[in-house]
Structures are given as C-alpha cells and as structure tokens.
Amino acid sequence: MTMVIGLTGGIGSGKTTVANLFGDYGIDIIDADIIAREVVEPNTTGLNAIVDKLGADILLTDGTLDRSKLRNAIFNQQQLKDWLNGLLHPLIREKMLSNISKATSPYCLLVVPLMVENNLQTMTHRLLVVDVDESVQIDRTQARDNVAPEHVKKILMAQASRQNRNAAADDIISNNGNSAELKNKVAELHQKYIKMSHLY
C-alpha cells in the first residue's frame, strides 16, 4: 500500500504550488478539485443524476455542466445543496480511493482544500498543512480571482480556522516566504516521506 500524505490549506495558501513541487519529484498527485470536475463529466452517474433532478437546462450546449447555473440553483437552497453533496461526496471519495490504489510513487499526495472541514484526513497517513498569514491569503486570492477583500474574508469564515487546521496537522509548511525557501522545505519533507514510506 502506498503511503498517503494529505495536503490542505486555506484559500490562497499555495496548495497547488506545493503540490507541483512534490510532483517535480515524480510523486503522484491526486487532486480533489480535479476529481470533483471528473465525476460530473458527460455520461457520468453524477451528471445524469443532476440532470434528472434539475432538468437539461443545467447543461451547456456542448452537454457539459453549466457550473454557474448550478451555483445559482443551490445558492440559499440548503436542501438542494445537501442533496448535491450527498450525491457527489461519495463519488469523489470512491474515485480518490481508486486513484490512491493506482499510485506507483513511494508515497502519493491527496490534495483536498476542505480536508479538515470534511474530516477526510482519515483517508491519509499524515496531514501536511500549507500555512500562511491571513493578509497574504487575502492578497493572493484577490490577485488570482480578481475579487474584493470582503469576498475573500467570507470564504475564510466558511473554512476551518487556521488554528484548527494547524492543530490537525502532522507537518506544517509555511508559505509566507519566497519560492526558494518553499522549494527547500518541500525537499526536506520529500526526503522525510521517502524514509517513512518504507513503513507502509
């Protein structure tokens, strides 16, 4: 069995950057965001169920899911949101487990933005948290998504607090510094995980 390192962090913390640095070492990356898109591709159980529930006008002309329409449909509709989560979460989990079983690197990285919030660290052997100051999160997310600081603060309020996330971590990587520092930290953790991977 491959050792699974869970990777998480708040919005704008640099999870993707950190994951890509591990990927440079040939480590298999399993990304929950990518899987969440895959389980609603055309002709999947997920998309078929959404169409059955909400009708064909939830699709774009090319037959793919109209994500903004879906977002609007579930906005302030808690029952519908719960139904959607009940449909998609098991599909995402099943695909994550399937991808983990196919991993060939000494350990693999399971990247889940809301890992602590959804208690998905139970799927991992260790949890690595990318930690960053809130002011940095706001600046980065504003620059990346072109949104107002208030919008970013709302997202931060909906996520686990920095303290809760860090308390759940086995390893914490700070991403307030420069890219050279981050590369060095990833290199150290990679060596540590390679040594630990022999235990699994």
Swiss-Prot record:
GO biological process: coenzyme A biosynthetic process
Annotated metabolic or biological route of this protein: Cofactor biosynthesis; coenzyme A biosynthesis; CoA from (R)-pantothenate: step 5/5
GO molecular function: ATP binding; dephospho-CoA kinase activity
Recorded catalytic activity of this chain's protein: 3'-dephospho-CoA + ATP = ADP + CoA + H(+)
GO cellular component: cytoplasm
EC number from the UniProt entry: 2.7.1.24
Domain DPCK: 4-200
Enzyme class, broadest EC rank: transferase
Keywords, ordered alphabetically: ATP-binding, Coenzyme A biosynthesis, Cytoplasm, Kinase, Nucleotide-binding, Transferase
Subcellular location: Cytoplasm
Job of this protein: Catalyzes the phosphorylation of the 3'-hydroxyl group of dephosphocoenzyme A to form coenzyme A.
Recorded family membership: Belongs to the CoaE family.
Name of this chain's protein: Dephospho-CoA kinase
Species: Photobacterium profundum (strain SS9)
Gene from which the chain derives: coaE
